[in-house]
Amino acid sequence: KLCLAGATAVALNAAPVAVFAKDEPLKVAFVYVSPANEEGWSSQHDIARKFVEEKFGDKIKVTWIENIPENADAQRVIRDLAQQGNKIIFATSFGYMNSVMKVAKQFPNVYFEHATGYKTSKNVKNYTARFYEGRYLAGMLAAATTKTNILGYVAALPIPEVFQGINAYTLGARAVNPNIEVRVVWTSSWYDPGKEADATKALIGMKADVITHHTNSTAVASTCEEAKVPVISYNSAMHKAAPTMLLGGVVHR
């Protein structure tokens, strides 16, 4: 499990003393790329948000905004949050990286935490986790389950984090069965339930009989449930979406 709540609390605890200097609450903001109430990447961040609100109480005032695409809207929203007096902003999706870097230059006294990125500055830091460890184990589980030796993988965008997951999953699977083939279908979006469902159906059509994903909705899990195909979830456990076909999940908490 990735401990997002712990990472978020550490980021707040590590904030410069000057940020906490005033008597008024520290203003903190979270920006999500998908709905906060649907199991997935954003919902796990929202669990972290609730955790830090409980931990810090009236010492902080938290704002969160969901469904912000990775385009000019992200830069506008992040800038607005900085202008509103937020001193720490969590930009929780890879594609927010350039927007964060641009806004950070304009607000040197605001601290930005960017998920899974690689660009930094004096007031921009990154956070990530060893996702590949869970992926490797998930691959082993899938290889022990498949009968066709074909595994399906619904992937969002061709970025290092996603390739890392695919590679780890494949290595884990081939540690159990060297004849495993992993077939990947791309959705070109972190959150598009329709495309995720279509990608899942396409993989089933390719004879993939165990499927996993690196996307943000429950569509892969629910589609596998309908098709009676075993699924390994990502981000959240997704028991409700696939109550009978869920093999396990790489869960971020």
Name what the model sees in each region.
Residues 2-5, 77:
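Generic alpha-helical secondary-structure signal
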Residues 3, 10-19:
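C-terminal segment of classical bacterial N-terminal signal peptides
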Residues 20-253:
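A residue-level marker of the well-folded mature domains of exported/periplasmic proteins
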